[in-house]
Amino acid sequence: MPEVEDTCFLTSPITVCRTKHLHLRCSVDFSSRALTGIAALTIQSQEDNLRSLVLDTKALTIEKVVINGQEVKYALGERQSYKGSPMEISLPIALSKNQEVVIEISFETSPKSSALQWLTPEQTSGKEHPYLFSQCQAIHCRAVLPCQDTPSVKLTYTAEVSVPKELVALMSAVRDGETPDPEDPSRKIYKFNQKVPIPCYLIALVVGALESRKIGPRTLVWSEKEQVEKSAYEFSETESMLKIAEDLGGPYVWGQYDLLVLPPSFPYGGMENPCLTFVTPTLLAGDKSLSNVIAHEISHSWTGNLVTNKTWDHFWLNEGHTVYLERHICGRLFGEKFRHFHALGGWGELQNTIKTFGETHPFTKLVVDLTDVDPDVAYSSVPYEKGFALLFHLEQLLGGPEVFLGFLKAYVERFSYKSITTDDWKNFLYSHFKDKVDILNQVDWNAWLYSPGLPPVKPNYDMTLTNACIALSQRWITAKEEDLNTFNATDLKDLSTHQVNEFLAQVLQQAPLPLGHVKRMQEVYNFNAVNNSEIRFRWLRLCIQSKWEEAIPLALKMATEQGRMKFTRPLFKDLAAFDKSHDQAIRTYQAHKASMHPVTAMLVGKDLKVD
């Protein structure tokens, strides 16, 4: 493979210049829904005689650009759809190789910035104060500030953020104090420092009426006060997960590991913003059963945040390794059979995704080609679960979990603070297992890495915990009408929450069931009363796919009350595919679109073919 090119950004490539540091001074204005401020970028030339450079921007208003106290010329290029507009800056004097320059750019964000969601007080739990959060992954940092918006560039950052004094600002950095705003007594300035170099997709900001509880020696959980106790209980295992992760990955270099529980419109399960993981409130099940998402985000502190994919084509390097670590953490906590149970559940998710895309779809390849493709549109479970399956398969080929964890720790050590490609990973795998090259050569690398569809080999899974889920799902799938009275509530008595969820996942793979079956399932198991978001999601999909009209309002409610795309997109798709709810689904989307997260609104619109 030739040297990879990042096709998602418009900025000068890393062979021309590299951003080393950002100092951000900005003010958050809820009335105009804008961040206004100055981004001071320390940029190092990578070549001699550098006279100009290009940064990524998206829907930004640029007021001026200053170098050494002097305004300099700049030009904003044409908007290129999802990529935004290139911004070319002329340097007053040519730079030689390794010379640095500080470029101060005065900017303002758009109220429609794809990186930011501005919530009205009514959209928060407290109903009193507005709320702002950012989501920069994959290529939305450019919609917050001008930058080299590529994961191949890593920088440190410091920030000073002015907000209304009744609110709290947090960033993906260590908190560095707060002071009254000297320019406005009704405002406060919060300061931050991120000393570890990070790709700019990990720059994050939240502003809201936030409170915190200490849940570990290096962990506070933050949320609005209405959720803070519940969150502290739900995520109490965080420190034990961190300790296991350090044992598997090496020292935790980030200092603090805080958690932030966001309002329901947050589009992902979690986002691994350093020092401050963002998570969806749909994890608040009340029984810690969805804490694997925390294990996942913790694992990113090594795979993703220390060792980073060089371009989004290689996103599986971030996610496959992180799922692999996540499942080892859960295995240490709950047993090896539990690790296999989740691994097999993940294979099922991969099957579903490939079925949805179609088995020849290019997005089902592990290494994708994102030339002229918005990474948000390509996003799916493939990099997570196909990536995990490859690593799990290699674990089984190369001598088991301990052997492969040895490789993983060495891999993190070798590539920490770097951005790498699949070839870098593969070359290191071969050098680490140099005595097992014969085994590695048996792997069909082309099929695994570059071919669409299911992987060429299915790993071996311990079935102990899955068998009961399969058995019960088969009873329902094969039941005739006269068999329905053989089901009762005790069917679930010996199943864990995870197994009930897997039972529904198994039924859903064979859906639709006859409507009478689904009605009987509600009679005996009362799934409508279950609040666990994963179970509720699969149950409502099953109801809609079986054309149960009574479930329509429940499914619409779940699709709009929260905005985690994993739930919202399939629910809207199922509702649109059912003739009795098709029009209502589209009307509901159109009514809620303005209050949805910008990425969610865009993707649901595409799914429903209305935008």
UniProtKB/Swiss-Prot annotation:
Cofactor: Zn(2+)
Positions of a peptide binding: 135-137, 267-272, 564-566
Protein's pathway: Lipid metabolism; leukotriene B4 biosynthesis
PANTHER family, sorted: LEUKOTRIENE A-4 HYDROLASE (PTHR45726:SF3)
Catalytic activity: leukotriene A4 + H2O = leukotriene B4
Activity control: Inhibited by bestatin. Subject to suicide inhibition by leukotriene A4.
SMART domains per the UniProt record, alphabetical: Leuk-A4-hydro_C (SM01263)
GO molecular function: aminopeptidase activity; epoxide hydrolase activity; leukotriene-A4 hydrolase activity; metallopeptidase activity; zinc ion binding
Provenance organism: Chinchilla lanigera (Long-tailed chinchilla)
Keyword Plastid: no
Modification type N6-acetyllysine: residues: 73, 337, 573
Gene Ontology cellular component terms for the protein in this record: cytosol; nucleus
Chain's gene name: LTA4H
GO term, biological process aspect, one: peptide catabolic process
Post-translational modification: Phosphorylation at Ser-416 inhibits enzymatic activity.
Function: Epoxide hydrolase that catalyzes the final step in the biosynthesis of the pro-inflammatory mediator leukotriene B4. Also has aminopeptidase activity.
Protein name: Leukotriene A-4 hydrolase
Cellular localization per UniProt: Cytoplasm
NCBIfam families reported in the protein's UniProt record: leuko_A4_hydro
One Pfam match: Leuk-A4-hydro_C
InterPro entries assigned: Aminopeptidase_N-like_N, Aminopeptidase_N-like_N_sf, ARM-type_fold, LTA4H, LTA4H_cat, M1_LTA-4_hydro/amino_C_sf, M1_LTA4H, Peptidase_M1
Site annotation Covalently modified during suicide inhibition by leukotrienes: residues: 379
Residues with Phosphoserine modification: 416
EC number: 3.3.2.6
Residues reported to bind Zn(2+): 296, 300, 319
Top-tier EC class: hydrolase
